[in-house]
């Protein structure tokens, strides 16, 4: 590969990594073309990009990424990068699920907002709630609070009316 082509790949990958909220390194050696296409499709559905490049080029691209120096330690054998732009947890869920069915896909390391996670932390990451799940839970909690406010106001008003009625009855007697 010509030097200009390599430099362009490094530049493109570096731009993607700068935008990423989560970067996951995987080993895919032994995955056939059909399984790789299936994996890429799963990533695409979740808004995650899966990129394969030479380790030396990935290492160059990681130089300006927060936590990239430690992530570079995982660049051995074949390396694929799952890049999560909107949801840093989505790649972990897909890698965990897909890896259970296909043992050839192995999680190496990940970085989320500068924090580096080793291979043994994949299950922890995959069980975390995604951004959309967290937003959904928060919206549900807000909805409960908002729907409770009228009930509380009605209860207070009812109690107030009852107290006023009792005071009025006492004054009449």
UniProtKB/Swiss-Prot annotation:
Cystine bridges: which residues?
none
Q: Which Pfam families match?
A: Ribosomal_L10
Gene Ontology molecular function terms on file: large ribosomal subunit rRNA binding; structural constituent of ribosome
Q: GO BP, one example?
A: translation
What is this protein for, i.e. what is its function? Forms part of the ribosomal stalk, playing a central role in the interaction of the ribosome with GTP-bound translation factors.
Q: How does it assemble?
A: Part of the ribosomal stalk of the 50S ribosomal subunit. The N-terminus interacts with L11 and the large rRNA to form the base of the stalk. The C-terminus forms an elongated spine to which L12 dimers bind in a sequential fashion forming a multimeric L10(L12)X complex.
Annotated protein name in UniProt: Large ribosomal subunit protein uL10
Q: Could you tell me which species this protein originates from?
A: Chlorobium phaeobacteroides (strain BS1)
């Amino acid at each position: 590969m010509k030097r200009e082509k390599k430099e362009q790949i490094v530049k493109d990958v570096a731009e993607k990594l700068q935008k990423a909220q989560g970067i996951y390194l995987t080993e895919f050696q032994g995955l056939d073309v059909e399984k790789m296409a299936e994996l890429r499709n799963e990533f695409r559905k979740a808004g995650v990009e899966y990129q394969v490049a030479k380790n030396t080029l990935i290492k160059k691209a990681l130089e300006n990424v927060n936590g990239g120096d430690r992530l570079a330690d995982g660049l051995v054998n074949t390396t694929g990068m799952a890049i999560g732009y909107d949801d840093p947890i989505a790649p972990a869920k897909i890698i965990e699920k897909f890896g259970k069915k296909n043992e050839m896909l192995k999680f190496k390391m990940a970085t989320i907002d500068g924090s580096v996670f080793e291979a043994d932390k994949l299950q922890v990451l995959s069980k975390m709630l995604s951004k959309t799940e967290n937003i959904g839970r928060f919206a549900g909690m807000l909805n409960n609070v908002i729907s409770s406010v009228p009930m509380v106001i009605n209860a207070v008003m009812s109690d107030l009316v009852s107290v006023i009625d009792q005071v009025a009855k006492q004054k009449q007697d």
